[in-house]
Each structure stands twice: as structure tokens, then as C-alpha cells.
């Protein structure tokens, strides 16, 4: 055993070898020594437990190769790019939508340079970081002012904490939503220090229910867009317009959590209709909050629009600093919003709309091409077909609506073969994520961004 221990090289000797000098030059002295120590310690442990040297100690070149390999792994980012073929275009677990080229350019420019984030160049003095985008949002929505935070949940929390702490907020029982990650409206209210007052029933809420619940401790009336579920049948709800008229009688504000939010008429694009921010503002709602990384097609952020006096209150609350966005997100968001100044070009420039508005003919062609490539790579255990599919927008947007789509389906007699195929897809340089349904593995091409890159990867695999 002592003889084996003597074969373990000293770290200082490894450092003086040409390979060691090269690795230190590339990765630094500290990182090289740390990795070498780990390997040497592993070698010692193996000698004690198994009375033999590990394979990498048989040749000195092997230990240098392993050190290099491990150091390279440390440089790799853990979040992998993937190909989304689930059929869910805005898949929350896969990062939702892609940014437009303009947004990417704006974000990259902000990363590489100083920007006038909170500085008025003309006046030569400090400014507010939301001001430039706020003016753009006002133009797009018709609102008096805007406030930007890091997501819509933060927007809801800020509104509640600013105006309802220690007070009551009235919400319809049918609108007490829970979204992914166990985000619940009642929990957010508790966190903000306000009391939830539920009115109506799960399926029916009347204007009188709100009226009967109003008292001297009421902070405001709240509407929550149930973006991830839909109640059908014997139902009744109260519109924003009705709530606004009621609130005026008691000098109370109305706030609306619009969730996914949309700044364009989806029906014009041939897609299912979704409530627009502009409509809520026009209805007289005092504050409207919505997400930026869902139907808007931008980075993760939350926007609150509404009456200037209320927005000023949000901007001055201590939580606003906690929840604010950085220069990169603000730059990408502004670039995304500027696309909406040219609505007829949205489907050409915003990836979310590019994917959602693809024709069936385009999808059929993509599916046939994908099938042809896969047929070359898969053996006779797998039967491939191009079939009609139903895709969805995702991220809690229009939960009951589906989009006609096309998919490549893979069938195998043995379920274990399909599981093996899924494992192979996940082991690719950029994993392919599909879905199981009807005893087949589905690869829905509507949600597949970077389609040519997908085919190239499969050709080379």
C-alpha cells in the first residue's frame, strides 16, 4: 500500500509540468490546485478501500485531462437550452416566451454599457428609473401613469401593501385564484397585512354582494382575472364597469389583477380573445396589473397602470425599491413595448406571436421534415406518424382554449422503449422536451422555436 501511495504525484510537481503550466494559465493557480487536491484525495481513498490506484493515475496525462474536464464543467452554466415540443407555447417550466431580437440587442447593450437609468441627461440630475418606459406605457394603454416591478405577483403585493394594510379588500369568491408555485391571492393578502373579504359564491357573484360588504374599513374593491381556469354553466359575475360605478358611490378605488395581460386584440391575429389592458383602463379601473413575460412577449416583469395619484403612492412605498427591475430588464421591456407601436408587425417581430400564428400548412411542413430526420435516427421499434394536435398558449393564458397544431407522434409496442427514447432526447446537447399522451410520445411543432437548429442537432446526433 505504501508503494501505491508513493506513486501519487505531488501538486507542486504537477504545476511544473507543461500541461500543468498550461492549465494554470487558462484557469488560474487557485482553481488548478483545488481540483488537483480533490483528485489526489480521491486516489488516496481508493488505495485505502480497494488497494489499487484509480484509472486516471495510471498515466500522468490522464490526471491533467481529468483536471481540465472538471474545470471546464465549472465554467458551464447549469441552465440548459432546450427545445420545447410540448405544444405549450408559453411553458412556465421552460422559461415561457422568447425575447425579440430588438429586446435581446437592448439588453445586451445595457449589459455592456452604462445607461441613463436614473439620470436626466437634459437636466443633468437624478431621475426615476421607470419614467421613460412609463411614458411609453401611457401611450399604449391610455393610463395616466405606470409603475414597473419584477413580476405580476410583486405588483399585486405592492398594491395591497400600499393601500390596504390593516384594511379590508373585497373579492369575489370565484376569483380567489391559485397559480403555479402555490401563489394564492389570500396568501398574498395576508403577507400584505390586509384582510380578505370574500363575497358571492364560487359560481355566482352579484353587485349587491359587493355593496353589502363595504364598510368604513374597506380599502378597495378588487377584480382578479381567472386566467388559468374558467367557470361555466350557471354563473354570474360583476364587470369592471359595474364595480367602478359602485365604488364611486363610496369614494373607493377599484383594482384589477389582469394576470397574463394583453396589449393587442388577439382576435385580430386569429387567436382566442383575451381581456386587454386598454379596456380595463377605459372602464375606469383605478389600478391594473399584468405580466410582461406571458402574452406581452417580453422579459419577466410586472406593470401597474392607472391613476397618477395612486401610482405615485406605489412609487414612494419602501417595497418598490425591493421589487424594482434592473437596467437589463428595463431595456428589454422598453424594446418589447416599442413593437406595440407597430401592431401590424407583431407577428413578424415578437417570437411569441410568430409561434402562435403559424398556419397549419407551415406546421404540417415542419412536422414532415422532423419526421424524416427522426426516421433516419430511430430503429424499427418506433413507428412515426404526423398527426393533428391541440396546442395551448400556456402560462395560465386562456386555459380552456386550444390551438390547432401538428405533431410527430412516436409509438412503440413496449412502453419501456418510449421511456428510453425520452431519455435519449433529454441526453442531447439541447434536450428535446415532448409529452406523453394516448400511449404515444408527442412532439408538437407549434411550440418549437429555433426549428432549423433542432433539425441540425438531430442530423448531427
From Swiss-Prot:
It is found in: Cytoplasm. The keyword Transmembrane helix does not apply. GO terms for molecular function: L-seryl-tRNA(Sec) selenium transferase activity. SUPFAM superfamilies: PLP-dependent transferases. Its cofactor is pyridoxal 5'-phosphate. Gene3D superfamilies: 3.90.1150.180, Type I PLP-dependent aspartate aminotransferase-like (Major domain). It is an enzyme of class 2 (transferase). Keywords: Cytoplasm, Protein biosynthesis, Pyridoxal phosphate, Selenium, Transferase. Pfam families: Se-cys_synth_N (PF12390), SelA (PF03841). It catalyses: L-seryl-tRNA(Sec) + selenophosphate + H(+) = L-selenocysteinyl-tRNA(Sec) + phosphate. HAMAP family: SelA. Belongs to the SelA family. This is L-seryl-tRNA(Sec) selenium transferase. It comes from Actinobacillus pleuropneumoniae serotype 5b (strain L20). The lineage of its organism: Bacteria, Pseudomonadati, Pseudomonadota, Gammaproteobacteria, Pasteurellales.
Amino acid at each position: 500500500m505504501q508503494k501505491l501511495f508513493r506513486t501519487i504525484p505531488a501538486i507542486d510537481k504537477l504545476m511544473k509540468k507543461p500541461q500543468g503550466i498550461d492549465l494554470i494559465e487558462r484557469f488560474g493557480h487557485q482553481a488548478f490546485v483545488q481540483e488537483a487536491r480533490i483528485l489526489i484525495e480521491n486516489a488516496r481513498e481508493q488505495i485505502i478501500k480497494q488497494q489499487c490506484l484509480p484509472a486516471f493515475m495510471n498515466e500522468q496525462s490522464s490526471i491533467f485531462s481529468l483536471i481540465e474536464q472538471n474545470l471546464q464543467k465549472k465554467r458551464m452554466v447549469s441552465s440548459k437550452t432546450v427545445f420545447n415540443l410540448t405544444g405549450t407555447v408559453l411553458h412556465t417550466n421552460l422559461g415561457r416566451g422568447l425575447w425579440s431580437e430588438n429586446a435581446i440587442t437592448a439588453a445586451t447593450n445595457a449589459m455592456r454599457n452604462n445607461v441613463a437609468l436614473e439620470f436626466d441627461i437634459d437636466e443633468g440630475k437624478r431621475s426615476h428609473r421607470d419614467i421613460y418606459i412609463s411614458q411609453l406605457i401611457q401611450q399604449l394603454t391610455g393610463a395616466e401613469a405606470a409603475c414597473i416591478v419584477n413580476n405580476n405577483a410583486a405588483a399585486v403585493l405592492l398594491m395591497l401593501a400600499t393601500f390596504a394594510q390593516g384594511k379590508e379588500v373585497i373579492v369575489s369568491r370565484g376569483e380567489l385564484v391559485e397559480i403555479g408555485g402555490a401563489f394564492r391571492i389570500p396568501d398574498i393578502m395576508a403577507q400584505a397585512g390586509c384582510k380578505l373579504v370574500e363575497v358571492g359564491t364560487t359560481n355566482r357573484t352579484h353587485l349587491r354582494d359587493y355593496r353589502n360588504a363595504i364598510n368604513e374599513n374597506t380599502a378597495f374593491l378588487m377584480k382578479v382575472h381567472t386566467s388559468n381556469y374558467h367557470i361555466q354553466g350557471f354563473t354570474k359575475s360583476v364587470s369592471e364597469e359595474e364595480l367602478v360605478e359602485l365604488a364611486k358611490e363610496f369614494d373607493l378605488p377599484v383594482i384589477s389583477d389582469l394576470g397574463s395581460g394583453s396589449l393587442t386584440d388577439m382576435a385580430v391575429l386569429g387567436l382566442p380573445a383575451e381581456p386587454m389592458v386598454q379596456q380595463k383602463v377605459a372602464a375606469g379601473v383605478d389600478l391594473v396589473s399584468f405580466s410582461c413575460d406571458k402574452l406581452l412577449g417580453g422579459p419577466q416583469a410586472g406593470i401597474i397602470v392607472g391613476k397618477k395619484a395612486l401610482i405615485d403612492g406605489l412609487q414612494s412605498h419602501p417595497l418598490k425599491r425591493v421589487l424594482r427591475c434592473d437596467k437589463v430588464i428595463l431595456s428589454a421591456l422598453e424594446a418589447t413595448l416599442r413593437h406595440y407601436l407597430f401592431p401590424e408587425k407583431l407577428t413578424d417581430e415578437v417570437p411569441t406571436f410568430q409561434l402562435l400564428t403559424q398556419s397549419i400548412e407551415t406546421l404540417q411542413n415542419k412536422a414532415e421534415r422532423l419526421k424524416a430526420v427522426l426516421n433516419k435516427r430511430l430503429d424499427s421499434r418506433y413507428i412515426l406518424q404526423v398527426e393533428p394536435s391541440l396546442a395551448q398558449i400556456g402560462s395560465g393564458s386562456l386555459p380552456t382554449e386550444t390551438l390547432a397544431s401538428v405533431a410527430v407522434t412516436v409509438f412503440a409496442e413496449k412502453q419501456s422503449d418510449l421511456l428510453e427514447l425520452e431519455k435519449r432526447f433529454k441526453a442531447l446537447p439541447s434536450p428535446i422536451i415532448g409529452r406523453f399522451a394516448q400511449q404515444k410520445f408527442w412532439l408538437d411543432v407549434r411550440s418549437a422555436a429555433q426549428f432549423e437548429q433542432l433539425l441540425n442537432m438531430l442530423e448531427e446526433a
